[in-house]
């Protein structure tokens, strides 16, 4: 699930994805993409 959070690497997406109520994420095309629970 893409969220509107800019990133350079996947580690930056851990907290934004948690805050969005999801598990973890990767950085895809400069934006975070989270995995739903």
From Swiss-Prot:
It is found in: Secreted. The keyword Disulfide bond applies. Changing residue 12 to A: Toxin selectivity change from Kv1.1/KCNA1 to Kv1.3/KCNA3 (no change in ability to inhibit Kv1.3/KCNA3, but important decrease in ability to inhibit Kv1.1/KCNA1, Kv1.2/KCNA2 and Kv1.6/KCNA6 channels); MeKTx13-3_AAAR. SUPFAM superfamilies: Scorpion toxin-like. The keyword Transit peptide does not apply. C-terminal amidation is not fundamental for activity. It permits a slightly higher activity on Kv1.1/KCNA1 potassium channels (native toxin IC(50)=1.9 nM), than non-amidated recombinant toxin (IC(50)=6.7 nM). The modification Lysine amide is found at residue 37. It holds the Pfam family Toxin_2. Keywords: Amidation, Disulfide bond, Ion channel impairing toxin, Potassium channel impairing toxin, Secreted, Toxin, Voltage-gated potassium channel impairing toxin. Disulfide bonds join 7-27, 13-32, 17-34. One of its GO terms (molecular function) is ion channel inhibitor activity. Signal peptide: none annotated. Inhibits voltage-gated potassium channel rKv1.1/KCNA1 (IC(50)=1.9 nM). Also shows less potent inhibition on Kv1.2/KCNA2 (IC(50)=105.9 nM), Kv1.3/KCNA3 (IC(50)=8.9 nM), and Kv1.6/KCNA6 (IC(50)=63.4 nM). Has the structural arrangement of an alpha-helix connected to a beta-sheet by disulfide bonds (CSalpha/beta). The primary structure of this mature peptide is identical to that of toxin alpha-KTx 3.6 from Mesobuthus martensii (AC Q9NII7). This is Potassium channel toxin alpha-KTx 3.19. It comes from Mesobuthus eupeus (Lesser Asian scorpion).
